[in-house]
């Protein structure tokens, strides 16, 4: 049993004064510390293991285990309530072994060439981590994608194991039909290649 009420941080722990919570190099955050944008990494997390025993772990050691537990519970529920057919369950957060239960979306990205390149690396990495289907938002989620970038991303996207074109509501539409014919034809060829 892996449900939210059984997994929670101990918010009364106030031991965030060590080198893990306050490293020498601090990335840019509004709060000027790592635990200000999340929970203290020294917090004790409590969870119920497969033998129904309450276990504890430090947040720094198993923070994403919560996401893994939710993926496992969702897969279990799905299989027990849908004639045991394997369904498509998409997650953004994960832990070692989560690919056994769900597929992975790489998260919100930007419409630029650097993010296109990074999506290839990330997709391969997550495949090595055991995810059978993984992919980014083709053409980028944030910012406006230009026709050349979107066309090239659609071509690369033909080879992602999880492929979708998706962007934020305030951004201009970036479906293949939104561009000039010269780009549409190339994108159409990419999609035909994917689904042949």
Show where each model-derived region lies.
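Catalytic-domain carbohydrate-binding cleft regions of carbohydrate-active enzymes
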Residues: 1-196
């Amino acid at each position: 049993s892996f449900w939210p009420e059984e997994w929670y941080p101990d918010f009364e722990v106030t031991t965030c004064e060590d080198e893990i919570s306050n490293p020498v190099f601090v990335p840019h955050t509004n709060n000027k510390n790592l635990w200000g944008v999340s929970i203290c990494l020294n917090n004790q997390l409590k969870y119920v293991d497969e033998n129904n025993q309450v276990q504890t772990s430090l947040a720094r050691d198993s923070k994403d285990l919560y996401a893994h537990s939710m993926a496992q519970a969702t897969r279990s529920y799905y299989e027990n309530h849908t004639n045991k057919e394997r369904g498509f369950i998409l997650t953004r957060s994960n832990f070692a072994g989560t690919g056994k239960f769900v597929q992975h979306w790489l998260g919100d990205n930007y419409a630029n060439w650097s993010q296109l390149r990074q999506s290839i690396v990330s997709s391969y990495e997550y495949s090595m981590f055991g995810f059978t289907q993984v992919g980014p938002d083709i053409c980028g989620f944030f910012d406006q994608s230009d026709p050349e970038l979107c066309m090239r991303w659609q071509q690369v996207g033909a080879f992602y194991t999880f492929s979708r074109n998706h962007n934020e509501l305030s951004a201009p539409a970036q479906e293949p039909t939104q561009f000039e014919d010269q780009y549409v034809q190339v994108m159409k060829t990419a999609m035909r290649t994917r689904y042949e």
